[in-house]
Amino acid sequence: MRVLSGTSLMLCSLLLLLQALCSPGLAPQSRGHLCRTRPTDLVFVVDSSRSVRPVEFEKVKVFLSQVIESLDVGPNATRVGMVNYASTVKQEFSLRAHVSKAALLQAVRRIQPLSTGTMTGLAIQFAITKAFGDAEGGRSRSPDISKVVIVVTDGRPQDSVQDVSARARASGVELFAIGVGSVDKATLRQIASEPQDEHVDYVESYSVIEKLSRKFQEAFCVVSDLCATGDHDCEQVCISSPGSYTCACHEGFTLNSDGKTCNVCSGGGGSSATDLVFLIDGSKSVRPENFELVKKFISQIVDTLDVSDKLAQVGLVQYSSSVRQEFPLGRFHTKKDIKAAVRNMSYMEKGTMTGAALKYLIDNSFTVSSGARPGAQKVGIVFTDGRSQDYINDAAKKAKDLGFKMFAVGVGNAVEDELREIASEPVAEHYFYTADFKTINQIGKKLQKKICVEEDPCACESLVKFQAKVEGLLQALTRKLEAVSKRLAILENTVV
């Protein structure tokens, strides 16, 4: 490691100070959350037919409660109603029944499944003709009040949904359709409002339905700029997004573990270390012979790394219907050992829960307890060959908000929109696709160039270039100070 002279260190410190004052460069790292919802008449329409087991219905109730928790509930804010259906329709509570969040949550806990058939069309008809009526607490149509129905179902309806859903949408009701398990996906599309990619959701089982609650929390949120309102704790920079915010630091500073305050970075360390985790799709559609090609792809990337305790560490996670850590960061200290562990990885088969894998990456793989190093660059490579069976948007966004560099690699039936959702900015440089597993080695070559050790922003390796940059910044700062002095002189003369 190069040792900086006293003069260089002084200049480096000065540059960092100037960058803090003048540079627009940001490194988003941490998010806060605060949400205020617009007035809404919201009716849940929930399938409790025989195919929904009691334990699964309890999962639905957890999902409903999580969405309700995020709302501003009140007579002049958001009102919530609940329609339960099977062969018949039962209104569990009307829009006017409960005016507090606590009362709503208690009412949800008391709901019991009905069993028997699946009359989804009848339930939607009840919602638009009865549940939104004046007598039940529905408010008059107004641009200031949203009318929303969220339908949750796990099967094929025994009646038609297309016409009644079209009438609901035409009357100004926004329809969301959530399908679980063996649901008829064409039915979901017939129910939902446009754009359908924002109004149709599918999960493989009720055990993961609560993952969708965050989506609806954000969908109902109308606060657009928490930074402008001052509802944040960021020390240097606040970046606003609907209902939330991201704390960041000026160039030359790093975000502390509290996600709010910043420290000047120190020379000779930081991003020269890389923690790299592979998230590998081991679903049934990959097939055993192609899974062996995926292993070679991983080893191809590993061969390009400087594996050591101080430079690159590698972790590996495989996912299908569940998530399995093959080995954590730091377990193996040589390329040879890493590649041997990759060769020994067994194929999981089953489903494609990419969202769950991304959440595992955030909650486990990049934690200190799993071998991640504070200050090391965090890189995730997600490899998949098909559409995810769970919701990926929240976890994908959070990974990027936390500063992880995310690459998305798709093969065959992989969905481009999902790859783009996962990939870091600029997206074109962080997502790759090929139609055939036999050509993934070409993607490996491209990735090798992308996964490089970033230059330490505090290292000042090129002193000539560095000094020129300092001089330029000093001149700019001098001009700004002169302009400020002139303004102060004018103000002083005005006062006198």
Swiss-Prot record:
Homotrimer. Part of a complex composed of MATN1 (via VWFA1 domain), type 2 collagens and type 6 collagens. Forms a complex (via covalent bonds) with ACAN; the interaction increases in abundance with increasing age of the organism via an increase in occupancy of MATN1 binding sites. Interacts with COMP. It comes from the Eukaryota. One of its GO terms (cellular component) is extracellular region. Disulfide bonds join C227-C238, C234-C247, C249-C262. N-glycosylated; reduces binding affinity for type 2 collagens. SUPFAM superfamilies: Chicken cartilage matrix protein (SSF58002), vWA-like (SSF53300). This is Matrilin-1. Residues 467-495 form a coiled coil. One of its GO terms (biological process) is protein-containing complex assembly. Its main location: secreted. Residues 1-22 form the signal peptide. Gene3D superfamilies: 1.20.5.30, Laminin, von Willebrand factor, type A domain.
